[in-house]
């Protein structure tokens, strides 16, 4: 199994380190041909508008939509979650639309640059997950096929739909491998019919 990590912006190297610690091989993706041999894709954080433009510029946008619609497991963190969304509040920016979610960008206020919080994520066990939020989005609406995995207060900050996983925070910056392991075990290895 080889996991592609979109390497246009953001903490892609950190994602690769976590994947390696989970025993998964990874490859940086910057060109369409690099999508050919991957079993899954991680879309890191960064600036979602910029990443969307770069996906178009590097001819990655359409191949990613087709692969995602065809069942490629995709894990998006922060800006990656925004790109996975069907709808982005107040924005017509490019998005992959692979999850039936609507998101709000910079949802915790632009003045709140970053913060950390303990999240209860039952699918990961009883121990809270220390999440790092950096100008984070959140999910304002989730369709019927979307499983909400975590909230911060009332705000949805982690969700799964089929083989797609989205987190508003940055698990790659924590040293906690559980979310990446969950993605590999439940979305990648378990196959399309996995329900959790």
From Swiss-Prot:
<feature type="active site" description="Nucleophile">
    <location>
        <position position="78"/>
    </location>
</feature>
<dbReference type="Pfam" id="PF01174">
    <property type="entry name" value="SNO"/>
</dbReference>
<feature type="active site" description="Charge relay system">
    <location>
        <position position="170"/>
    </location>
</feature>
<keyword id="KW-0456">Lyase</keyword>
<dbReference type="GO" id="GO:0036381">
    <property type="term" value="F:pyridoxal 5'-phosphate synthase (glutamine hydrolysing) activity"/>
</dbReference>
<keyword id="KW-0378">Hydrolase</keyword>
<comment type="pathway">
    <text>Cofactor biosynthesis; pyridoxal 5'-phosphate biosynthesis.</text>
</comment>
<dbReference type="GO" id="GO:0006543">
    <property type="term" value="P:glutamine catabolic process"/>
</dbReference>
<dbReference type="InterPro" id="IPR021196">
    <property type="entry name" value="PdxT/SNO_CS"/>
</dbReference>
<feature type="binding site">
    <location>
        <begin position="134"/>
        <end position="135"/>
    </location>
    <ligand>
        <name>L-glutamine</name>
    </ligand>
</feature>
<protein>
    <recommendedName>
        <fullName>Pyridoxal 5'-phosphate synthase subunit PdxT</fullName>
        <ecNumber>4.3.3.6</ecNumber>
        <ecNumber>3.5.1.2</ecNumber>
    </recommendedName>
</protein>
<comment type="similarity">
    <text>Belongs to the glutaminase PdxT/SNO family.</text>
</comment>
<dbReference type="InterPro" id="IPR029062">
    <property type="entry name" value="Class_I_gatase-like"/>
</dbReference>
<feature type="binding site">
    <location>
        <begin position="46"/>
        <end position="48"/>
    </location>
    <ligand>
        <name>L-glutamine</name>
    </ligand>
</feature>
<dbReference type="InterPro" id="IPR002161">
    <property type="entry name" value="PdxT/SNO"/>
</dbReference>
<comment type="function">
    <text>Catalyzes the hydrolysis of glutamine to glutamate and ammonia as part of the biosynthesis of pyridoxal 5'-phosphate. The resulting ammonia molecule is channeled to the active site of PdxS.</text>
</comment>
<dbReference type="GO" id="GO:0004359">
    <property type="term" value="F:glutaminase activity"/>
</dbReference>
<dbReference type="GO" id="GO:0005829">
    <property type="term" value="C:cytosol"/>
</dbReference>
<dbReference type="GO" id="GO:0008614">
    <property type="term" value="P:pyridoxine metabolic process"/>
</dbReference>
<feature type="binding site">
    <location>
        <position position="105"/>
    </location>
    <ligand>
        <name>L-glutamine</name>
    </ligand>
</feature>
<keyword id="KW-0663">Pyridoxal phosphate</keyword>
<feature type="active site" description="Charge relay system">
    <location>
        <position position="172"/>
    </location>
</feature>
<comment type="subunit">
    <text>In the presence of PdxS, forms a dodecamer of heterodimers. Only shows activity in the heterodimer.</text>
</comment>
<keyword id="KW-0315">Glutamine amidotransferase</keyword>
<dbReference type="GO" id="GO:1903600">
    <property type="term" value="C:glutaminase complex"/>
</dbReference>
<dbReference type="GO" id="GO:0042823">
    <property type="term" value="P:pyridoxal phosphate biosynthetic process"/>
</dbReference>
């Amino acid at each position: 199994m080889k996991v592609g990590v979109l390497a246009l912006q953001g903490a892609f190297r950190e994602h690769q380190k976590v994947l390696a610690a989970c025993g998964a091989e990874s490859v940086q993706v910057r060109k369409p041909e690099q999508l050919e041999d991957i079993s899954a894709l991680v879309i890191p954080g960064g600036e979602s508008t910029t990443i969307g433009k770069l996906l178009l510029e590097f001819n990655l946008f359409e191949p990613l939509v087709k692969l995602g619609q065809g069942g490629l497991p995709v894990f998006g963190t922060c800006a990656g979650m925004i790109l996975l969304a069907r709808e982005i509040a107040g924005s017509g920016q490019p998005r992959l639309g692979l999850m039936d979610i609507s998101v709000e960008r910079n949802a915790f206020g632009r003045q709140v640059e970053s913060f950390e919080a303990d999240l209860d994520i039952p699918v990961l066990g009883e121990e809270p997950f220390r999440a790092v939020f950096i100008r984070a989005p959140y999910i304002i609406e989730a369709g019927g096929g979307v499983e909400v995995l975590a909230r911060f207060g009332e705000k949805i900050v982690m969700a799964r739909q089929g083989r797609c996983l989205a987190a508003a925070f940055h698990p790659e910056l924590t040293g906690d491998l559980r979310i990446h392991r969950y993605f590999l075990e439940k979305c990648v290895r378990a196959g399309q019919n996995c329900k959790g």
